[in-house]
Amino acid sequence: MGYAAVPPVERGSCSAGANNRDITFDFVKGILIILVVLGHLLQLVIYRNTDNFWLSPYFKAIYMFHMPLFMAISGYLASGTILRTSFCRAVGDRAVQLLIPMLFWCALIETAKLAAFFHFSGVTAGLLDFSRELVGTYWFLWAVLASFLLTKLFAAFNLLSKWILCASAIVIALMPITLSIVPLLRYTYPFFCLGFLFAQTIEEQANTMLRHKSLLMFSCWAVACLCFLDWGRDTYAYNNLVLVHDAQSAKQVLLMFTGSAAAAAVAAQSLFHCWRVLCSTRLARLVAVELGQSTLLLYLVQGAVFRLTDLIQFGELWDGKTRIVVASAIGAAIFGAATAVLWIVNDLGYVSRIIVGAPRRLKRSS
């Protein structure tokens, strides 16, 4: 999610800037980070104080694929680093890129909580609360880092065959560990492997997909639609914990992985097509450059905003229209705040790395 790696050029038809960077994946990431914010707005504002968001078709449509596709893109874009960079440097760079901004924004959350509630329960309790924020609020970044580390370990020992990666994805997905965010890591790791493997066999896959593209996409659409219809509250990894203990739980876990994979494939192909059609328009390039190249910062900002709003009591008596207006305002504020932060710190060297993770490699071309 937060990678600044330059994607390969075979995908897109439009590049940007003097370095001819293909920003196809930036466009896809820009759309996905919008969906991340929309999903949280549905959960924490539109359906606030209820559990009805689990049954929302909009929430379902987003959560079926947005994080799996984000993880697959992370695996795809990280493949070059995993294969060509030394273990210590690759892991160190990725840890610095992700962990330092996480620490900064979690410290900001804790400071805001302390200032708002004027309650300090001691150093030990404060550290425990900080660790919970660090792990829970930004679980996806931990999933990216863990997936990167595990895949890099396989590379370090020359064990990166597709069979070993596929086996590792299955074993990790089925491990009966439900501690903290481990179920979410087990859910997303197979998609990281899928993206990584696709990057290694892009030419072979491209030829196969061109020959059978219509059949493949029809099959993915059909599977995604069927899974959407059968998708329920217990199909989400947050609720089933990716745990198989009987026939019903096995059905839900299988439905979750199958539906997520099919929906992610449909979404990816649809977004690639949108980019090919719209890449010359100002709006599409704004999404790619301003949002897609700032997904790490946007994820950090929205996590902080939603964590703080979750601690405030509001909206009990609001009607639907009021909730939509407030959700729109919060969403706009998130993107506005992230843009302002990036504008302020983008050229400040180490300050930028602490707050943003890494500056964007591409400015908007004139």
UniProtKB/Swiss-Prot annotation:
InterPro entries: Acyl_transf_3_dom (IPR002656), Nod_factor_acetyltransferase (IPR052734), Nod_factor_Fuc_AcT (IPR053490)
Keywords on record: Acyltransferase, Cell membrane, Membrane, Nodulation, Plasmid, Transferase, Transmembrane, Transmembrane helix
Recorded GO CC terms: plasma membrane
Membrane topology: Multi-pass membrane protein
Record-annotated membrane-spanning stretches: 27-47, 62-82, 98-118, 140-160, 164-184, 212-232, 253-273, 286-306, 324-344
Compartment(s) where it occurs, according to its Swiss-Prot or TrEMBL record: Cell membrane
Superkingdom, natural source: Bacteria
Single GO molecular function: acyltransferase activity, transferring groups other than amino-acyl groups
E.C. numbers: 2.3.1.-
Family from the record: Belongs to the acyltransferase 3 family.
Classification via NCBIfam families: fucose_Ac_NolL (NF042426)
Protein's job: Thought to be an acetyltransferase that modifies the fucose of the nod factor.
Protein name, per record: Nodulation protein NolL
